[in-house]
Amino acid sequence: MGILYSVWRSKEMSDFLLNVSATMSRSRANGPGLRAVVWVQGCTIGCAGCYSSATHPHAAASLIRPSEISEWILSIPDIEGITFSGGEPFEQAAGVLETIQAIREEKGSDFSVFVFTGFELEVLQRSEDDNVLTLLEYIDILSAGPYDYKLRDQKLLWRGSRNQSLHFLTQRYPSANIDDWIFQSPLEEITLTSDLINFTGFVGPKSKMLRAVEKIITTNEAI
């Protein structure tokens, strides 16, 4: 079974381009430890109730060469890995793979890879796309499966609903560490800049924490 995905190419170069919705240089809510995060733009799965629904359209957001993304990631000190989310990373498997390969050439396998996908692992393993199959070989942890609003669970680690599953595809991270990660990895993460509130996590776009921060910023009220 193949996977539908969009391929963007530079007009000046043969490189694949990643259609990127957003990036974060440091996050503790999107995988083990301190990680950079890339949210790709575009997802044909379109799960109902997805709190990243703005990343579903395959319209061009920021088209970036994988080499530029990898250089940015390599410039960030003290992170242990990269996380790809979305959107759907496997619908841009060629660009994601090229990015990870460039990073691994510099950092080696000690630099870990975490990917969120709405596809089940078995579907990805049956793909006829070589980029999808090769990408799987680079991933340490895969959070897989479509989000099901009826099965949502705020206590899950790096998942939004009970039908989703974590797959440890290498020996890098023992699955026995899950209990420790539950306490170390926040469910919600908010970073503030001079003009933006950046929210990431697994509780929902209008969670208690986010509403509280919005209240402080808009009214200067303490809680």
Where are these regions (language model features)?
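P-loop/Walker A phosphate-binding loop and immediately adjacent motor/lid segment at beta-alpha junctions
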Residues: Q92-K107, R152-L196
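Short beta-strand/turn micro-motifs composed of small residues
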Residues: T117, T170, G201
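N-terminal [4Fe-4S]-dependent radical SAM core
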Residues: L4-W39, A48, S52-H58, L187
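Charged phosphate-binding loop/patch that engages nucleotide di/tri-phosphates or the phosphate backbone
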Residues: S185-I223
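Structural recognition of alpha->loop->beta junctions
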Residues: E128-L151
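Cys/His-enriched microdomains
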Residues: I45
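Conserved Radical SAM active-site core
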Residues: F16-A22, L34, S52-D130, T134
